[in-house]
């Protein structure tokens, strides 16, 4: 990591290229801003390094984190916050970069549940209250779309998805909605 050497990120970029410099920069920022203990930094560096040798090791680590997040309720609140923060900052983005979009979404939602308990609860209640009505309307809409396209000789498959609490919260924040 660059703070432990006389080299800068730019030196690394010139010698090894943008990809390596970008990785070094990310690890350096994480070390400075997020992970305070050497043990944590070493652990995350080992995870990133294992990407080069065997992706299965990273998959096991991400799976383990997902399991830990699903059973986090048994831990003290301070540990919940710490683990949820690590998950949000490291594991969810890593899962996303590896194309594990459903896992990323699960990690984000579980992290959100512990980091923003009130907001998560409000959104979850709102989703459950309107779920039956929304499902019925969405099914009618999809049926109409498929019928109209079929009438015009177009075969299609219409799929739907439900936004999850973290995604809704993030969108609300982006649009400055309470």
Task: Indicate where each model-derived feature is located.
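Active-site helical microenvironments for divalent-metal-assisted chemistry
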Residues: 1-177
């Amino acid at each position: 990591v660059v703070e432990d050497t006389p080299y800068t990120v730019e030196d690394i970029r010139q010698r090894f290229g943008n990809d390596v410099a970008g990785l070094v920069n990310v690890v350096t920022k994480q070390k400075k801003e997020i992970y305070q203990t050497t043990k944590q930094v070493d652990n995350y560096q080992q995870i990133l390094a294992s990407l080069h040798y065997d992706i299965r090791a990273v998959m096991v680590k991400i799976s383990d984190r997902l399991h830990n997040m699903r059973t986090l309720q048994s831990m003290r609140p301070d540990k919940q916050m710490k683990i949820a923060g690590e998950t949000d900052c490291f594991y969810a983005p890593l899962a996303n970069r590896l194309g594990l979009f459903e896992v990323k979404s699960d990690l984000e939602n579980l992290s959100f549940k512990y980091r923003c308990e009130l907001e998560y609860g409000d959104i979850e209640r709102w989703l459950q209250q309107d779920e039956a009505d929304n499902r019925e309307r969405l099914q009618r809409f999809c049926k109409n779309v498929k019928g109209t396209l079929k009438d015009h000789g177009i075969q299609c498959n219409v799929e739907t998805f439900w936004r999850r609490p973290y995604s809704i919260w993030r969108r609300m924040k982006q649009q400055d909605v309470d």
